[in-house]
């Protein structure tokens, strides 16, 4: 191939965070998060200047819908709501801002034609989450830190 690969679309969200889970869980064989399922694609892309585009950034699972305002994710939605209120944006904007805050400089793919939803997603660019907020949201999604 003569044209270099400049982006890669991968499923990634605060709820579908396998791209970053494995290194954090690698010494814990009691959880499925310790299994390397992606061949270190995040590190590969960063080393080769390939931009990761997060597709389905608000989805959980493949066909289960969004995690935002979903009663199956009460802790995550509570945390998203607290940060959203403080920042003056929606929970959707905070969920996207969480992706944008990652040092890999990811892009989020907005798979919607709804103008209100697009505005919420664009509002994420107004928010720069602190490291503390980023990790608190990660923990609220049911993950843990070493």
Model-derived regions, located:
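Beta/alpha (TIM)-barrel catalytic core signal, keyed to glycine-rich beta->alpha loops juxtaposed to Asp/Glu
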Residues: 1-146
């Amino acid at each position: 191939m003569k044209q270099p690969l400049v982006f890669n679309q991968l499923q990634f969200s605060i709820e579908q965070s396998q791209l970053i889970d494995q290194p954090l869980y690698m010494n814990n064989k009691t959880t499925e998060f310790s299994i390397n399922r992606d061949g270190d694609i995040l590190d590969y892309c960063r080393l080769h200047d390939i931009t990761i585009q997060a597709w389905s950034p608000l989805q959980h699972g493949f066909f289960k819908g969004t995690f935002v305002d979903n009663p199956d994710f009460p802790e995550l939605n509570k945390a998203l709501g607290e940060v959203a209120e403080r920042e003056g944006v929606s929970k959707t904007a905070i969920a996207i801002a969480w992706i944008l805050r990652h040092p890999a400089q990811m892009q989020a793919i907005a798979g919607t034609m709804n103008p209100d939803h697009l505005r919420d997603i664009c509002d994420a660019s107004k928010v720069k989450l602190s490291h503390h907020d980023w990790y608190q949201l990660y923990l609220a999604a049911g993950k843990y830190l070493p």
